[in-house]
Regions:
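Positively charged n-region of N-terminal signal peptides that target proteins for export
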Residues: 1-4
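Hydrophobic h-region of N-terminal signal peptides that target proteins for export
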Residues: 9-17
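N-terminal, post-signal-peptide metal-ligating segments of extracellular/periplasmic oxidoreductases
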Residues: 16, 27-29
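Boundary of Sec targeting at the N-terminus
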Residues: 17-19, 237
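Aromatic-lined carbohydrate-binding surfaces of glycoside hydrolases
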Residues: 29-44, 49-59, 65-78, 83, ...
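Short Gly/aromatic-enriched secondary-structure transition segments
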Residues: 87-88
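Conserved short beta-strand edge segments in small beta-sheet-based binding/regulatory domains
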Residues: 96-99
Length: 273
């Protein structure tokens, strides 16, 4: 019982002191968090600061960063701290994190911060993505690739990303409850590379039907994506409902709909009138 309680207390303690910025650093390069000290500061102003003394005053000649002299990144959100990390690596350490290389090897000794640096922005909401991006290579990303993308967004200050993964899961659940069969659902929901154009009310069923394991896979993936975005302090934008329904909804469900016709030869979903 004592061991169980001790384990529970340790788990609670670890959760209480979880630091998303340190986790991000360690994903960039294992052990990198030990070379930094990230400090979350309460402020209405979006900012980050880079320092190396902890008090904002360099009273001695700057020394290379080390275990007892870490690079200090302050910010009023984890995303802003991540921007500060990226700024330091790029402008102080000469390390450029690219979209195709999110894990550069950091030197054992990082360059010193010669003087305190502060950057602010009045742009409170920084949005990313549109529907089309979710049906390019992103349609087939796994959790490992999504982790890198969320890190990339954080490093570049994105705090309001569109989160459209798994929208088809919600639609499937709703249509099944309305009496549609799995086969009929498959004829309405598009395949992975065409989901964006289906969600934009341009076509039905093209590239489908989706296999049953796809829905569970994408539901699980979206839950991980949302959890990580929220952990970083982002505000994910979830798709709303625009009135789209299957083109046969009038016949099947007795709904008052408007026929949207064709889009480049594709049957479009109907719209609620």
């Amino acid at each position: 019982m004592k061991k169980l309680l001790l384990g529970l207390l340790c788990t609670i303690a670890l959760g209480a002191y979880a630091n998303p910025a340190d986790d991000l650093l360690n994903r960039i390069d294992k052990g990198a968090a030990a070379k930094f000290k990230t400090i979350l500061v309460k402020s209405d102003k979006d900012f980050f600061e880079i320092d190396q003394t902890g008090n904002g005053k360099n009273t001695t000649a700057p020394k290379p960063a080390g275990k007892n002299n870490p690079i200090i990144i302050r910010g009023n959100s984890w995303v802003n701290i991540a921007v500060g990390i990226n700024w330091y690596l790029k402008h102080h350490a000469g390390i450029h994190i690219t979209w195709n290389n999110m894990s550069p090897k950091l030197p054992n000794v990082l360059p010193a911060v010669k003087q305190k640096e502060r950057h602010e922005t009045d742009l409170k909401l920084r949005y990313d993505f549109n529907y089309c991006t979710f049906s390019y290579t992103m349609a087939f990303w796994d959790w490992n690739r999504w982790q890198k993308e969320i890190d990339w967004m954080a490093l570049h200050g994105i705090n309001m990303p569109l989160a459209a993964v798994g929208t088809e899961c919600v639609w499937r659940n709703m249509l099944l409850k309305l009496g549609y069969s799995e086969e009929e659902v498959g004829k309405f929901i598009a395949g992975p590379a065409f989901l964006a154009w289906w969600e934009m009310n341009n076509l039905e069923g093209w590239g489908g039907p989706l296999p049953q394991n796809w829905y569970k896979q994408q539901e699980t993936l979206q839950k991980k994506i949302l959890a990580r975005m929220k952990e970083m302090g982002m505000k994910p934008v979830l798709p709303g409902y625009c009135g789209m329904v299957p083109h046969d909804a009038k016949k099947r469900l007795g709904l008052n709909v408007t026929d949207a016709g064709k889009w480049n030869g594709y049957q479009r979903p109907a719209n609620l009138s």
